[in-house]
Every structure is written in C-alpha cells, then in structure tokens.
C-alpha cells in the first residue's frame, strides 16, 4: 500500500507542469528624451513606457512609480545609469542620463 501511494505521488509530481519561463523582451523605447527602456520581463515595452511616463518625481537611487513598481539603480550614478523596476513577476530596465 505504501509503495503504491509513493509511486502515485511521484507520478503526480512529475506530471505537474513547471513554472512557465519568464519572457524577456529587448526594447528600445523612449519614455522621455533622457529615459530609454532597454528591456522588459513578463510585460510589453509599451506598458513599461507608460508606467515610467506616469512617474513625475525625481529619478533617485530608489523610488516607486504610480503603477506600483519599485525601482532601484543598478549601475552608474545620480546623473547617468541604469535602473531596474520590479512588481511581482514583472520587471523592466531603463537608462537615464541627465
């Protein structure tokens, strides 16, 4: 009985589909004259552009967009660099230069 239960459990675990791989898109979309969206994961480039355009605050080391994305600088300095914005499974990267 235990072997049958263990065998059934193993078969069920093998048949459960794995998590779908993340779809990463390469973008070359400008949200503004000094904001270039370079890539987007699990979202369209147009959606990332719209989210970044709705942010009217300063581009600091860390900030949050109105769409709920948490953004953080991953390289560069306050005047030029690359930021990564994340919300659950969605993410995008953008480059800023002043």
Task: Please place each PLM-identified region on the residue numbering.
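Positively charged n-region of N-terminal signal peptides that target proteins for export
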Residues: 1-4
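Short N-terminal segments immediately surrounding and downstream of signal-peptide cleavage
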Residues: 23-34
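Bacterial N-terminal signal peptides
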Residues: 6-15
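Sec/Tat signal peptide C-region and signal peptidase I cleavage site
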Residues: 18-22
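Extracytosolic low-complexity repeat regions of secreted or lipid-anchored proteins
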Residues: 33-38, 46, 50-98
């Amino acid at each position: 009985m235990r072997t049958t239960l263990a065998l059934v459990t193993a078969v069920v675990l093998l048949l459960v589909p794995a998590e779908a791989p993340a779809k990463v898109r390469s973008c070359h979309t400008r949200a503004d004259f000094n904001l270039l969206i370079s890539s987007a994961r699990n979202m369209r480039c147009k959606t990332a552009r719209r989210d970044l355009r709705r942010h009217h605050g300063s581009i600091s080391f860390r900030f949050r967009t109105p769409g709920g994305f948490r953004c953080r600088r991953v390289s560069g300095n306050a005047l030029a660099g690359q930021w990564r914005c994340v919300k659950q499974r969605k993410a995008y990267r953008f480059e800023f230069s002043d």
